[in-house]
């Protein structure tokens, strides 16, 4: 079987969704700039070799509608001979794009793919136009479409306290801020034009949503937002609302080597799994277990892990049941996570994978895992191996 490898991976800075730096920048532009960036960073690649552009996006309407993958690829000047498709596995969309490209390469259906994802949550809110079929209530809990309430349920089932959630959130902001100050995001962030608070055009080079001033005391003052009476999940322990995109150049290994392109990581295994929609945040557990089994390794073999932080109340049960509670500070989300950086839905899968690969390089690590939960009860996971 042919091998799929990551040649390059980049992301935009994460912009605040409410009056943030990308308030005047469209989702197609965020996407197109990264597509162009991959080609500029890898001049050995003839763009005419691109088989397909596979782009994750959840809210496929307004500026994100009508196949944003094709719209953005045309905007970027990708040759018209390349295909383009937009995929939607909710929060796991751009990780699913990774999987689709990898499967195509492994089965000989192409050897050069640009993948990624985008979500401009300031322009197209998560709830825009959502209309669940009333019959779903016959099969799943009525609150299953309310992500915050699923986090409340999962946290309660696993005895996760408010204090544990607050501490996890503080850690996310501290780690992300330290990574910013120390330049650890510099290799993955691709500067995009935006506007400052006064409306001046600027090159955005850093994430906007990190709150380094976050403390246990400031979080303790916040009220539960999803279950005001009995809940523990607050805005501060939930992923921030942000706008952003991420992108990867994925190729067949021998083709990349023939062109003299760098091989940053190999895709070792992939998996998706389902779980009860009422505790959708638990999805990373069965998905990770599948991916590890397919790779022929155990969780102890992993050097670095990126677990998408949809909610602290969701992440902590996954950490516990994957047997990772004792290695959080050594292996998991070492540069912070979505609580600090935000979770632009269609962007996040390739974003956490990009961060993971950079961390693996920084730490000279061999094996890494990127995994995330998905609304309505799914999980997705990818094991990467440096070569």
Curated annotation (Swiss-Prot):
Record-level GO BP terms: fatty acid beta-oxidation; phenylacetate catabolic process
Pfam families: Thiolase_C (PF02803), Thiolase_N (PF00108)
Transmembrane feature ranges: none
Role noted for this protein: Catalyzes the final step of fatty acid oxidation in which acetyl-CoA is released and the CoA ester of a fatty acid two carbons shorter is formed.
Keyword RNA-binding: no
Main location class: cytoplasm
Coiled coil: none
Organism: Shewanella putrefaciens (strain CN-32 / ATCC BAA-453)
Keyword Transferase set for record: yes
Family: Belongs to the thiolase-like superfamily. Thiolase family.
Pathway in which the depicted protein is active: Lipid metabolism; fatty acid beta-oxidation
Gene Ontology terms, MF aspect: acetyl-CoA C-acyltransferase activity
Enzyme nomenclature, EC number: 2.3.1.16
Assembly behavior: Heterotetramer of two alpha chains (FadB) and two beta chains (FadA).
Protein name: 3-ketoacyl-CoA thiolase
Active site: residue positions: 91, 343, 373
Catalytic activity from the UniProt record: an acyl-CoA + acetyl-CoA = a 3-oxoacyl-CoA + CoA
Gene3D superfamilies for this protein: 3.40.47.10
